[in-house]
Amino acid sequence: MAVIPTQPSAVDLEILEQSVRIVQAAKCEGLIVLNACPARAPEIAEARGYAASLGLTVAAIGERRPFARAFAEGAGIAERERGPASDEVAALWSEVATQLGIAPRTKRLVNVTA
């Protein structure tokens, strides 16, 4: 399985197509993760649509202060606090586990575009 992290910026999305072609040529499962997505930014929907048009599942992780606080403490977000940030990471892991055929312990991503 290949997880392709990218930010929802024009520069990152321009390179994304090459990464997706490599994953598809390898004939393996793939997941595009739009990372550090600003809240309520209209460009996110556009970035999601473009990423989805490339043929892989798309997930999004928001740009949230709890991630920075957890990093500064040397902790994972699940160790740091409960809330949208930890829910997004748990849902992301669930999607990865599902694609790998591992029984996930949490719900799948709600905001996935296939």
Question: What spans do the regions from the language model cover?
Answer:
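Hydrophobic anchor at the start of a short beta-strand
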Residues: 2, 29-31, 57-58
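C-terminal boundary of histidine-terminating zinc-finger modules
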Residues: 71-91
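Inter-motif core of Ras-like GTPase G domains
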Residues: 1-9
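Charged phosphate-binding loop/patch that engages nucleotide di/tri-phosphates or the phosphate backbone
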Residues: 86-114
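Loop/helix-junction capping segments adjacent to catalytic residues or to phosphate/diphosphate-binding pockets
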Residues: 10-13, 40-42, 86
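Conserved C-terminal guanine-recognition region of P-loop GTPase G domains, centered on the G4
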Residues: 13-39, 47-51
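Beta-strand-loop-alpha "switch" segments that mediate conformational coupling across diverse proteins
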Residues: 38, 48-76, 95
